[in-house]
Structures are given as structure tokens and as C-alpha cells.
């Protein structure tokens, strides 16, 4: 019977065959190849240390990928066959002798990369094998901390087990970046993963506990249960799935009530037990029977003892009070009066407090008081801002100048006054009930102070993280897309362009100064008013505002007059330079009217921005239709299907007045991309735009236009030179007319553009062309008949030429 070879858990896969083809000693070589392809640490390394290197496949990969003249050292318990450019020796990495040997090979160098692909001899219990491998990883890390350079890389194999997380924690303390990965060449059934640690911190001193397996893999003691929280805050319960206690299989604890009375820690019993039993034991219990007959032991107490897990804070307090009463009756607790009488003889002497200590305590108390006050003010300010944001989001804002006209200059006619409240009888109501409400609200605010501050800080932190992640995403996107980088560069260039100062800047600063002034509503007195408005503004309260208004109008009028005069002079200069048109006198007239008219308070920079828009010579805006939507709208307005009022009405939609203040950048980008009106377009408009872009794209680019221009310029230069030479030949009396004509013809032929060389057409001698004599049918110009024999002759000629060269 033939012997069938076992495949050993699928180890003879494609990586095994590839390792045989490439000449690697083990399939594990491809694990390092894939790790290096992902992280790229071998190309940057000059010195490498490979721990547990047998049979040497990782050293082979390192010798191929690392630069020339690199130092590679491999060590293992098993012997390693020699590898070119690699130093190998046989030692145990846990011994001091191995450290000395490595130090002798490295000399004064530090390793840029330390590799570890070792594993113990497995085959016993899995828990023991995983722990042995974790210990081996810790030993390799100890060697790495001794020989690794600052910023170096450490790559190790780890088994997935309960010791994996402690190892990962140790790695993160010593390296800047720690990533766990599983290369494709690693078998899926294998529990191994590879941890790549980059950026070694190289601390000056390392705590020995970091590299001690007894300390790193020690099992943590169970935390003491918080029974006080279970008793005093039973409503706030968080399930913690931590398993069961040893030996507690039923999860139900029942103890007699006498144990609860006699214990010194009743809260622990209430937090851990399920029931307090009044049931008598078989032998009988006199104390338990007495407890059951006491008048303090009511039916409510008995019901509470039946199930402690469903009780609330109030019921637990009742049980504790009942316990104290019972202990006093049984004489287990001494009353406070008796305790004072017994301890009256012993009087404690309190030493007077030192002056310096008293000053320190007073300063500490004042500092705490000041911090509490600032925290309270900050909380109120945050609450006010939050309410203001909510009001703005819900469009609940109201004009703040409504009712301001009733205020006098000193505020004597304010809306609220204490005298009016006393007359109306509201002062007593405020003193009785409102003050209590305020105090209660302040106490509630003080309780929720910490939670609100924490939630506010957490929200700000999350927003900052989202913004930073979005910026990283944008940078990665720009790195991949060259068009996006060019677009951003154009935006930055346009933003950096400086065109000097303009009058609008000065006007903007004047507006800011005006905004800084208090908002005192000024009622216009000039102009046409309705009857109701005239009656309203005839009140006594508006009589003192005329002088103030006139002074402000005069000041603003002088400024606006100077601006208008400057614009008028500029317009006149432009009209002198440009040809006169019909629109010029109208513009000049408008400028004069604005200069002579009284300036209004509502004038802003928007009126001056219109003059900066690009315009044609005839005064019309220089607007080009480049989208299908614009073309469709232009066609509709040209045919009369839509009017300007319809276009104005279409501008009022749900996309027009979106509130974008305070929104993050990533949200605004997404909204601008997707949340926009979808305007219908016609087939004719789309075709017109396509035709327009087709005509634009048909035009040659700038480089082609420049090349054609250069060719035309050179041709013109040649013709001019030829004309001058022809004139010289015509004036030469020594030459005959025939010679002159021939010389001019030769110069013309040389100056003329040469015809492109006609390619020789190859005709294969097979089929109808086999053995043909003369020109084949359908072939014009130069031709050459070729066959397979000719190919062989050409190859033979090339071989002979090479031999002669040698």
C-alpha cells in the first residue's frame, strides 16, 4: 500500500510552494515581506537583530531588503546554516552570555530594528503554551530595550490569550505607535498575530517591573464591592458582567435577622444579601423570637426583609433605624446621654492654633470660595449662551430696540421699578414665594454643576476631534487627487493677492465705530409720512431728538459728499478715456444726484460693491452663461415664459436662508454638495451648453497656439531673407538671366517645407503574392516584399555582426 503524506494542517499551501521557488528556508519569510510592505522599516534600517531566527528565512528577507553594507545578526537555540551578509550564532536569549555575544557583534552600534518570531515547544495545555510564548516575548522585549536605538522598530509574534492585553500595555509605555496585524500568509487557524512597535522612546531608566513576567502577568485582585452605593443609591444600577463568585451557584443569600442586628457593618449585609429571615432554626433561637414580637417590628419591616434587592433608599433607611432601636432595647448601644456622663471626666485639651496655620487655612478658604464663585458665574454664562443658541436656532429672536423709544436718556422711564411693584402689591408676593423658587433653582443648579461642565467639555472635545479627523481626510484626499491640489493652490493664490486699500475699508471702519455706539432709535422727521405715523411721532418723547439727528446727518453727509465727489471725478476720467455712449450721461447724472441728495443711515458697503463688478464698454454686466440651468432660465426669460418677478420669487426657498453659524466645516461641505435646489433643464438648453463647450474645447491650447505662431514667424523670416538674396542676385550683372533663375529656384526649393519621407510598405509573400514578379495589385508608392526566409537571413546577419565585434 502506498504511503500517503500528511499535509500538516494545510501548511503545504501556495506560500510553501512560493518559498520553495524563491529559495526561502520557510514559508514564514512571506510574513516579514508583507509586514515590510505595509510599514517599510527594513529599507530604513542599517543594523538589525533577529531573535529566534532559525531556520533563517527572516534573515534572508532582511539581507535582500536592507541597504548594502548593513549589519544583520541572528540568534537562536537551534543551529542556523550560514547566510550571506548575516552573522548567526547559537545561544539562549534569556542568558547573560547571549547579551555579551550580541554586544560583541554590534560593538558601539545600536539596532534600528529588532525582530522576534519565536515560539516555545507547544503540545501541552494551550494555557501553558500561550503563557510560555508571552514570557518569551517579554524576554525579547528586554533585549530590545537594551540594544534598540531611539525611534527604532520592534516586531514580535504574540499568541492571542489573556496575557495579550498586558503585553500590549507594556508596548504602549515604551513605543510611540503600537499596531497589531495579521499578514495574509499567516494561517487563519493559527492564533498568532504580529505586533509592530515603532518609535522607541528610549527612556533613561526602566522600572524592572515592566519586564518582570511575575508582575506583568499577575492576576489582579477583585475590587471590593461598593455596598454603600447599593444601599444609598439603589436606583442607579449598572450591570457589570464579571462572572459569579466562587461557590455562589444560586446567587441567592439569606441570613437570619439576628446576624444583621449584631453585625458591625450592616451596610455590607444590605448590599450583598437578598433576604433577612425571621424563620426559627430547628433548635430554636430566643433572640429571633423576641425580635419577631417587638412592637418596632412592623409588617412593613417584615415585608422589606423579604426581598432586599427591590428596596429603595427610603426603605433601607427605615431598616437601619429599626436596627438602631432594637440594639438600644437589647443594650447593645449606649445612649448618648450616658456616654456623655461617662466621658465627662475626660476632657480633651485642644492646643491653640498657630497664627501662620490660621492664615493658611483662611487663604485656602477664600481661594475655595473664589473658585466656587467663578465656577458659578461660568456656569450661568454657559447656560445663557446655550439658551441664546436655542432661541436663534428656533428663530425666537426678537428685535432688541422694540420699546426703546420709551426710555429716557437716564433710564428714569424704565419698564420695571420697585415703586410700581410696591403699589401693585407684588413686592410681598416676591418676598414670600419667588425668593424660595430662586433658592431652590440655585441649589438644583449647584447639584448639576459638575455634570453640565463635564458634558460641555466632552462635547467640545468631540467637536475638535471631528474637525481634526475631517482635516486629515481632506489632506489624504488632496494627496491622492492632483486636481484637488491644483484647485486649492489656485484658491490660496487668489486669497494672497493684495490690491491695496480702498475707500470701502475706511467706510467699513466707520461703520464699525457707528455700531459700537449705543443703539438709540432715531425717528426720521423729513420725508412723506402717513397720518398715523405723523401722529405717532408728534409725541413729546421725540421732541429732543431733532438736534442730535441733525448733527449726525451733517457729519455723515460731509463724509458721503466727499466719497460721492471722488467717485464722480473718477467716472469723468473714465468717460474721457472711453468713447462716449448713451449710458454715460445717465451714469453721470445718477452720480450727481447721489452727491446732492441727503445720505441715509441704511447705506452700506453693498452699494459700492456693485461698481466693482466686471462690466463691458456699453455698461452691461460681463456675464457668461456656462451651465445648463442658466441657459434654460435665459431661454424661458427670452421667450416670455418667465418674468423677472418669477425668478425673484423662486429665490425664496428652503435653501436660501439656512443658518450656518457655528456649524462644523465637514457638515457645511456635505450640505453644499447635496442640499441644493434641483432646477429643471430642457433638452435644448443642455444641447446648447454642450455645443458651447465643444467649441471651447476645440480651440487649441496655449502651447499649440504659441508653437504655430513661432512657425509662422520663422517662415516669415525665411521669406524675408530669401527676398533680400533674390534682390542681390537680380542686381548681379555678371550672371545671366538663366543662371539667376536657376539660383533663385534652388533657394526657393531649399526654403520650401520638405515633404515627409514616404514609408516603405511591406508586402508579405504569401497567398496571391507568392512568387509574384512586379508590383502587387493595390499597392502604391514604395514597397518591399518580405517572407519568413528573409527574417531568418536578417537574424543570421545580426549574429555574424556580433561575432565580428567580439
From Swiss-Prot:
Subcellular location: Nucleus, Nucleolus
Chief subcellular location: nucleus
EC annotation from Swiss-Prot or TrEMBL: 2.1.1.-
Keyword line: Methyltransferase, Nucleus, Ribosome biogenesis, rRNA processing, S-adenosyl-L-methionine, Transferase
Reaction it catalyzes: a ribonucleotide in rRNA + S-adenosyl-L-methionine = a 2'-O-methylribonucleotide in rRNA + S-adenosyl-L-homocysteine + H(+)
Pfam families per UniProt: DUF3381, FtsJ, Spb1_C
Segments passing through the bilayer: none
Region (Disordered): 368-389, 435-527, 543-623
GO cellular component, one term: nucleolus
GO BP, sorted A to Z: maturation of 5.8S rRNA from tricistronic rRNA transcript (SSU-rRNA, 5.8S rRNA, LSU-rRNA); maturation of LSU-rRNA from tricistronic rRNA transcript (SSU-rRNA, 5.8S rRNA, LSU-rRNA); rRNA methylation
Residues where S-adenosyl-L-methionine binds: 56, 58, 76, 92, 117
InterPro entries registered for this protein in UniProt: RNA_methyltr_RlmE, RNA_MeTrfase_FtsJ_dom, rRNA-MeTfrase_E, rRNA_MeTfrase_SPB1-like_C, rRNA_MeTfrase_Spb1_DUF3381, SAM-dependent_MTases_sf, SPB1-like
Catalytic class of the enzyme: transferase
GO molecular function per UniProt: rRNA (guanine) methyltransferase activity; rRNA (guanosine-2'-O-)-methyltransferase activity; rRNA (uridine-2'-O-)-methyltransferase activity
SS bonds (residue pairs): none
Positions annotated as active site in the UniProt record: 157
Compositionally biased region (Basic and acidic residues): 461-484, 578-601
UniProt biased composition (Acidic residues): 441-460, 494-515, 546-556, 602-612
Protein function: Required for proper assembly of pre-ribosomal particles during the biogenesis of the 60S ribosomal subunit.
Family per record: Belongs to the class I-like SAM-binding methyltransferase superfamily. RNA methyltransferase RlmE family. SPB1 subfamily.
Subunit: Component of the nucleolar and nucleoplasmic pre-60S ribosomal particle.
Protein name: AdoMet-dependent rRNA methyltransferase spb1
Amino acid at each position: 500500500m502506498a504511503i500517503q503524506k500528511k499535509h500538516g494542517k494545510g501548511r503545504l499551501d501556495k506560500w510553501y510552494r512560493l518559498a520553495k521557488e524563491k529559495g526561502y528556508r520557510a514559508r514564514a519569510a512571506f510574513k516579514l515581506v508583507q509586514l515590510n510592505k505595509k510599514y517599510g522599516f527594513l529599507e530604513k534600517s542599517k543594523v538589525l537583530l533577529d531573535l529566534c531566527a532559525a531556520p533563517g528565512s527572516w534573515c534572508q528577507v532582511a539581507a535582500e531588503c536592507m541597504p548594502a553594507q548593513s549589519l544583520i545578526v541572528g540568534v537562536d537555540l537551534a543551529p542556523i546554516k550560514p547566510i550571506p551578509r548575516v552573522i548567526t550564532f547559537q545561544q539562549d536569549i534569556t542568558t547573560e552570555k547571549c547579551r555579551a555575544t550580541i554586544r560583541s557583534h554590534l560593538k558601539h552600534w545600536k539596532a534600528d530594528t529588532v525582530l522576534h518570531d519565536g515560539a516555545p515547544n507547544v503540545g501541552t495545555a494551550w494555557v501553558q503554551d500561550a503563557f510560555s510564548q508571552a514570557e518569551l516575548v517579554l524576554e525579547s522585549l528586554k533585549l530590545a530595550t537594551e540594544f534598540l536605538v531611539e525611534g527604532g522598530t520592534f516586531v514580535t509574534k504574540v499568541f492571542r490569550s489573556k496575557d495579550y492585553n498586558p503585553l500590549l500595555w507594556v508596548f504602549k509605555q515604551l513605543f510611540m505607535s503600537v499596531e497589531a496585524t495579521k499578514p495574509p500568509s499567516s494561517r487563519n487557524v493559527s492564533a498568532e498575530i504580529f505586533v509592530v512597535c515603532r518609535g522607541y522612546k528610549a527612556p533613561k531608566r526602566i522600572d524592572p517591573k515592566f519586564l518582570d513576567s511575575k508582575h506583568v502577568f499577575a492576576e489582579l485582585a477583585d475590587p471590593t464591592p461598593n455596598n454603600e452605593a447599593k444601599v444609598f443609591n439603589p436606583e442607579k444600577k449598572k450591570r457589570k458582567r464579571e462572572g459569579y463568585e466562587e461557590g455562589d451557584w444560586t446567587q441567592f443569600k439569606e441570613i437570619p435577622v439576628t446576624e444583621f442586628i449584631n453585625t458591625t457593618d450592616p451596610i455590607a449585609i444590605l448590599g450583598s444579601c437578598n433576604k433577612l429571615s425571621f424563620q426559627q432554626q430547628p433548635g430554636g433561637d430566643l433572640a429571633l423570637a423576641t425580635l419577631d414580637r417587638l412592637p418596632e417590628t412592623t409588617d412593613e419591616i417584615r415585608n422589606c426583609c423579604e426581598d432586599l434587592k427591590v428596596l429603595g433608599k427610603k426603605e433601607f433607611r427605615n431598616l437601619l433605624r429599626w436596627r438602631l432601636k432594637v440594639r438600644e432595647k437589647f443594650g447593645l448601644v449606649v445612649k448618648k446621654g450616658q456616654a456623655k456622663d461617662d466621658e465627662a471626666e475626660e476632657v480633651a485639651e485642644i492646643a491653640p492654633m498657630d497664627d501662620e496655620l490660621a492664615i493658611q487655612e483662611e487663604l485656602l478658604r477664600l481661594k475655595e470660595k473664589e473658585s466656587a464663585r467663578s465656577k458659578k458665574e461660568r456656569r450661568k454664562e454657559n447656560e445663557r449662551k446655550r439658551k441664546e443658541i436655542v432661541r436663534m436656532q428656533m428663530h425666537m429672536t426678537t428685535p432688541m430696540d422694540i420699546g426703546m423709544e420709551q426710555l429716557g436718556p437716564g433710564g428714569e422711564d424704565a419698564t420695571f421699578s420697585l415703586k410700581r411693584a410696591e403699589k401693585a402689591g407684588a413686592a410681598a408676593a416676591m418676598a414670600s414665594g419667588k425668593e424660595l423658587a430662586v433658592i431652590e433653582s440655585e441649589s438644583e443648579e449647584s447639584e448639576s454643576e459638575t455634570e453640565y461642565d463635564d458634558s460641555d467639555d466632552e462635547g467640545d472635545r468631540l467637536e475638535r476631534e471631528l474637525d481634526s479627523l475631517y482635516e486629515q481626510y481632506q489632506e489624504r484626499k488632496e494627496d491622492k487627487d492632483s486636481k484637488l491640489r491644483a484647485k486649492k493652490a489656485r484658491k490660496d493664490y487668489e486669497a494672497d493677492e493684495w490690491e491695496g486699500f480702498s475707500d470701502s475699508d475706511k467706510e467699513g471702519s466707520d461703520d464699525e465705530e457707528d455700531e459700537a455706539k449705543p443703539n438709540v432709535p432715531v425717528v426720521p422727521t423729513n420725508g412723506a409720512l402717513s397720518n398715523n405715523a405723523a401722529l405717532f411721532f408728534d409725541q413729546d418723547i421725540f421732541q429732543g431728538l431733532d438736534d442730535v439727528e441733525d448733527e449726525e446727518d451733517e457729519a455723515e453727509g460731509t463724509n458721503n459728499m466727499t466719497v460721492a465727489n471722488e467717485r464722480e471725478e473718477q467716472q469723468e476720467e473714465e468717460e474721457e478715456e472711453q468713447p462716449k455712449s448713451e449710458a454715460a450721461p445717465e451714469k453721470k447724472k445718477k452720480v450727481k444726484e447721489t452727491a446732492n441728495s441727503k445720505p441715509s443711515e441704511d447705506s452700506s458697503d453693498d452699494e459700492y460693491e456693485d461698481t466693482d463688478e466686471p462690466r463691458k464698454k456699453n455698461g452691461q454686466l460681463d456675464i457668461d452663461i456656462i451651465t445648463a440651468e442658466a441657459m434654460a432660465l435665459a431661454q424661458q426669460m427670452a421667450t416670455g415664459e418667465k418674468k423677472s418677478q418669477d425668478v425673484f420669487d423662486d429665490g425664496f426657498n428652503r435653501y436660501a436662508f439656512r443658518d450656518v453659524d457655528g456649524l462644523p466645516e465637514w457638515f457645511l461641505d456635505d450640505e453644499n454638495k447635496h442640499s441644493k435646489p434641483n432646477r429643471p433643464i430642457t433638452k435644448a438648453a443642455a444641447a446648447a451648453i454642450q455645443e458651447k463647450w465643444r467649441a471651447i474645447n476645440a480651440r487649441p491650447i496655449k502651447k499649440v497656439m504659441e508653437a504655430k505662431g513661432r512657425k509662422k514667424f520663422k517662415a516669415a523670416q525665411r521669406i524675408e531673407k530669401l527676398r533680400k538674396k533674390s534682390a542681390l542676385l537680380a542686381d548681379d550683372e555678371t550672371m545671366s538671366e538663366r543662371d539667376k533663375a536657376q539660383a533663385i529656384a534652388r533657394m526657393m526649393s531649399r526654403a520650401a517645407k520638405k515633404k515627409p519621407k514616404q514609408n516603405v510598405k511591406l508586402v508579405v509573400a504569401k497567398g496571391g503574392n507568392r512568387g509574384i514578379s512586379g508590383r502587387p495589385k493595390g499597392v502604391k508608392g514604395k514597397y518591399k516584399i518580405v517572407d519568413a526566409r528573409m527574417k531568418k537571413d536578417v537574424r543570421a546577419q545580426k549574429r555574424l555582426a556580433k561575432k565580428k565585434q567580439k
